[in-house]
Amino acid sequence: MAGQEDPVQREIHQDWANREYIEVITSSIKKIADFLNSFDMSCRSRLATLNEKLTALERRIEYIEARVTKGETLT
């Protein structure tokens, strides 16, 4: 009987080692996905803020160009 238990025990230990390895990889993939999602949200937020600032600057430039074209003073 002892001879039959050794291969079974080895298979059980190997199975647990494989499961632990898979758990480590799964956990790492989840961490990477969480980071990428967070990075995506951060980038989108920053780009939206930058877009708002650029839009405001474009409007100011158009206003100033219109005043210059009409010959108005800027003061």
Curated annotation (Swiss-Prot):
Query: What keywords are assigned to this protein?
Result: Coiled coil, Cytoplasm, Cytoskeleton
Residues annotated as signal peptide: none
What's the chief localization of this chain?
A: cytoplasm
The disulfides recorded in the entry are: none
- InterPro entries of this UniProt entry? BRICK1 (IPR033378)
Q: GO molecular-function annotation terms? A: protein-containing complex binding
Enumerate the transmembrane spans: none
Coiled-coil residue windows: 41-72
Q: Which domain of life is it from?
A: Eukaryota
* Cell location: Cytoplasm, Cytoskeleton
A single GO BP annotation from the record?
Answer: regulation of actin polymerization or depolymerization
Which cellular components does GO assign to this protein? cytoskeleton; SCAR complex
**The family this protein is said to belong to:** Belongs to the BRK1 family.
Q: What does this protein do?
A: Involved in regulation of actin and microtubule organization. Part of a WAVE complex that activates the Arp2/3 complex.
**Protein's name according to its UniProt entry:** Probable protein BRICK1
